[in-house]
Amino acid sequence: MKMTSKKMKDELMKKLSRPEWDFHYDSEKEVLRIEQKDSKKGINVSLPGVVAKWEVNKEKAIEEVAYYVQEALIAMHKEENSAAKILPVIRSTSFPKQAEEGNPFIMTDHTAETRIYYALDSNKTYRLIDERLLQKLGLTEKQVREMALFNARSLGYEFKQDTVAGNTFYFLNTNDGYDATRILNESLLQSMREKISGDMVVAVPHQDVLIIADIVNEIGYDIIAQMTMKFFAEGHVPITSLSFVYEDGDFEPIFILAKNRKKTDGKEKG
């Protein structure tokens, strides 16, 4: 049998077939690239060189190249995961629950409108953790949740502030992909609660913003409702157009007629 670059490509693809790897063949340069699907990191194999080795060592040449490629890709993957951080991300309850059929994401309930997912972030790549990835990482769901919340608490925050009609609005927008995630930082929420004199209202209209408001009158409720709707419509990854009253660690959704609820509460007190 005469070995050609095309035949060698087929032989290597058979030996290196794994669901997490992709193959790209450049017929002009006679190069086969094997790379990780998620990170796009990979190895280029010059096929004429492997064919020349095959002429001398036959099957052993193919085995050696396949082994080298496999070990290199596995090492890349381990290095990437060791540098990666697991962080929680906030998504709408309408966000898909599965990566694909039979492979659910790791999730935690948050509010009536939001759910917590978990991302493996290595700065260059960002992937939501599903059951298959969980197995590859060798972690339990509990470990993922604990690591994610620990890392969320390490995220910095610096708010911009605006006051309208006596109501103060604090905006966090670092565009690091985790602005909404700061809603899970209990110490941050408590520190804001201490400086707020009225109702503490929190909103995560999309992934890249966290709004905390000190609402002291009905106009404030109208403003936060309009503001949240606007941010929700403009967001790259929208979450919810509703905002929440935060009290004692709980989030109560505010509906469009929140100001009417406030009026009713006032009459009952009277």
Curated annotation (Swiss-Prot):
Family the entry assigns: Belongs to the UPF0354 family.
Family matches, as HAMAP family: UPF0354
Name this polypeptide is given: UPF0354 protein BA_4944/GBAA_4944/BAS4588
Species the sequence originates in: Bacillus anthracis
